[in-house]
Amino acid sequence: MAIKVVKNLVSKSKYGLKCPNPMKAEYITIHNTANDASAANEISYMKNNSSSTSFHFAVDDKQVIQGIPTNRNAWHTGDGTNGTGNRKSIGVEICYSKSGGVRYKAAEKLAIKFVAQLLKERGWGIDRVRKHQDWNGKYCPHRILSEGRWIQVKTAIEAELKKLGGKTNSSKASVAKKKTTNTSSKKTSYALPSGIFKVKSPMMRGEKVTQIQKALAALYFYPDKGAKNNGIDGVYGPKTADAIRRFQSMYGLTQDGIYGPKTKAKLEALLK
């Protein structure tokens, strides 16, 4: 049985502030609200305040409420005016994450089912699901991350998607390929070094580090989004380690911020 979505959409008079751009979504981004408000209160507050911050859905223990049309962008991932998270992803807020407990667990359970439903409706696989942290490094969804359950949550979404008869993966690297055609002619041109790269003193520097950074940026895991050259500076510092850590988290690798054989292999597979 499909999950009913209650619509309480932002007024068109506020589109310029909350959702100014038409959008053809390519991802779903999961958030935790970091407060204990209900879905109704989350949407009401989002709609009526003067901040540009916005999101498409809020999910609590009882219902899913929509505040922004899915064919409009929302400002929910902090990766800038033209960032992929803000411009190409559907934002889903899971309520009651501040205190956790029974209500939060029920909200998360409903959100898992709802995200699977969104995937099924669009013919997408689990590879289209992101966490807020993947876009700009923010520690969100905070409760899921602090409890070390991101992979568990993704696995649960995938299981629900299978129950709905959906496919668990989109066409191989289709999104990553599509999104980088304007910035790089061929991903196969990205040579990746062998060996271990990590933060140490003195910091590791040079062309091999630049190669790693360019590969991460090609997949939208920027060392420093918005900085000069998106942080591609040939220095393996904390920001590059964080980009590696976000990449590892997304693809089920050990989240240590260290570039090694397994991280290299996954990067190469996605860049083919």
Curated annotation (Swiss-Prot):
Family annotation (PANTHER family): N-ACETYLMURAMOYL-L-ALANINE AMIDASE AMID, N-ACETYLMURAMOYL-L-ALANINE AMIDASE XLYA
Species the sequence originates in: Bacillus subtilis (strain 168)
UniProt xrefs under Pfam families: Amidase_2, PG_binding_1
SMART domains, A to Z: Ami_2 (SM00644)
Alphabetically ordered keywords of this record: Cell wall biogenesis/degradation, Competence, Hydrolase, Sporulation
Cysteines joined through disulfide linkages: none
Protein name per Swiss-Prot or TrEMBL: N-acetylmuramoyl-L-alanine amidase CwlA
Catalytic activity: Hydrolyzes the link between N-acetylmuramoyl residues and L-amino acid residues in certain cell-wall glycopeptides
Gene encoding the protein: cwlA
EC number in record: 3.5.1.28
